[in-house]
Amino acid sequence: MIGPLNGLRVGLLTASASRLGGGVFEAVAAHAAMIRDMGGAVHVFALEDCFSHDDAPRFAGSPVTVLPVKGPQQIGFAPGMVRALLDADLDCLHLHGIWMYPSAAGAAWASRTGKPYFISPHGMLDPWITARGRWKKALARLGYERRGWSSAQALHALTLREARDISDETRRNDSFVIPNAGPDPIGTGTKAFPSPTMVYIGRIHPKKNLIALVQAWHGAVRPEGARLEIAGWGDPDDIALLQTVIAQGDGSARFLGPAFGAAKEALLARARFVVLPSHSEGLPMAILEAWAAGIPTVMTAECNLPEGFSAGAATECGRDVAAITAALDAAWELGAEEWQARSDAAIRLASDRFSPAAVSAAWATVYADTTENQRRGARLP
């Protein structure tokens, strides 16, 4: 395919090329498709996990190399990764996500080849994240992260807020900001007013603040027949705690387990709202997917999508039970006409700033500049 990246060989490096990677996996899969659509050649590198081979088709025929892990999975030491990167004869390498061994492998590749190397932390330098597992992150900084940050051509931020976090952590002020792309919008125009169903889709993890959400749900003023449907995956202990709190209610909230593909589409199709009360996010794909489907959202400011509030596509909730309860009450008070206006605003955002076309154009400029700057021996301005 001929395009602005015609012939450019781009490596995408990440901890997980499967559903276990959550939103980062979805972002990498979308990024790979975008590069292919612009004429580039993509090679994906990741640590092997139980879903690696099942989910490889998400990369639509691009080569996916997964390396077996030696030792603790949370570190992800894969002794064959550096050699695999070097053997791929890449023009540039792009790391998605940090704090695991792929960061060390990427830094080694950059040092040995001198070729352009990009890092997208995906919100993993948010203070809420860096405050957790402090000693492990301190070892990672000393062992390889700082080396990688200094050797990168540039660091990529999803939002201006993340750009500040990157600067605070790395002492580099040259990061560039490009948001994740959402899916193309699913239809436009007037939608049928959905039944009172609120949906969460994503990882079951403390940072998602789901315990507070369910407790707020139990205390909210809800319309007749209202349901909270939580779909996701995570640590068994986190899931068990969530199910315990759900069981304290009246049966209107339920945990569905993981939802992918057609199951996820069916969930979105019946949702009046998508909710995300997170303590910390990079730029959540779940929200972009909701907006592309014309579904307004209830979310925290920590989702880093202030455009949603200003455009009227989202209701802001706080992170404590009382604030979430108030936001749920406000959402349920919206009538069909007000809800439709918010649905229209969501579609507009998905069609404009977060559209695949807009995001692709921004990345085409970055990658094209990469090749030019490589010839000149310069970093991105």
PLM segments and residue spans:
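N-terminal strand-loop element at the rim of the active site
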Residues: 5, 13-21, 27-76, 233
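Short hydrophobic beta-strand element within catalytic cores of glycosyltransferases
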Residues: 296-300
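Conserved acidic donor-binding segment of nucleotide-sugar-dependent glycosyltransferases
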Residues: 313-322, 331-336
